[in-house]
Amino acid sequence: MATTKALHLTRCTLYVAPPQQLANNRHTHGSRFRGRHVDRLRLLDESVKDNEHIIKLTDNAQKKIKQLAAETEGESLILKLSVKNGGCKGLQYKLNPIRKDEIEADDYVQQFEELKFILSIDATSVIYIYSNILDYSYDLINGGFKFINPNATKKCGCGKSFNV
């Protein structure tokens, strides 16, 4: 596997609730987060406080991001990462370009100045993204960004769908 570089996530400056309230925030996370999910939220809170790794980028992902950022004509490339219901295993990754004003107040945000890249992770999706590796495949069939998720109990062969 290609070498990885860490992606450290920080809270968007507009976020008003402290990270330790994440596990108790029923409005954001709903009642479906119990047991191991709450444990994962606690680990995430500790990681954000200690500025530890949330997600990693492989060399291939970094190369593709640099290429996409070069096409933005001086602006930083901003991608929104979220997890939605769907796909063949129940949950599906969504990675879409957005404008800076579309970053939501409770998103986890990371800037990669050397890549001219900003990653905005939806607050309700962060629990599923924790410890993932973002890779890029140049394969003709099923090429594109792929997620390697060590938390997934079921995975789709395409790398875009999973379950926990």
From Swiss-Prot:
Family note: Belongs to the HesB/IscA family.
Pfam family, one: Fe-S_biosyn
Organism of this sequence: Plasmodium vivax
Record SUPFAM superfamilies: HesB-like domain
Record: residues binding [4Fe-4S] cluster: 88, 156, 158
Keywords associated with the record: 4Fe-4S, Apicoplast, Iron, Iron-sulfur, Metal-binding, Plastid
Function per UniProt: Participates in the sulfur mobilization (SUF) pathway for iron-sulfur (Fe-S) cluster biogenesis. Involved in the pre-assembly of [4Fe-4S] clusters and their transfer to target proteins.
GO annotation (BP), single: iron-sulfur cluster assembly
Protein name as annotated: Iron-sulfur cluster assembly protein SufA
Protein's cellular compartments: Plastid, Apicoplast
A Gene Ontology term for the protein's cellular component: apicoplast
Pathway of action: Cofactor biosynthesis; iron-sulfur cluster biosynthesis
Subunit structure: Homodimer.
Alphabetized GO MF terms: 4 iron, 4 sulfur cluster binding; metal ion binding; protein-macromolecule adaptor activity
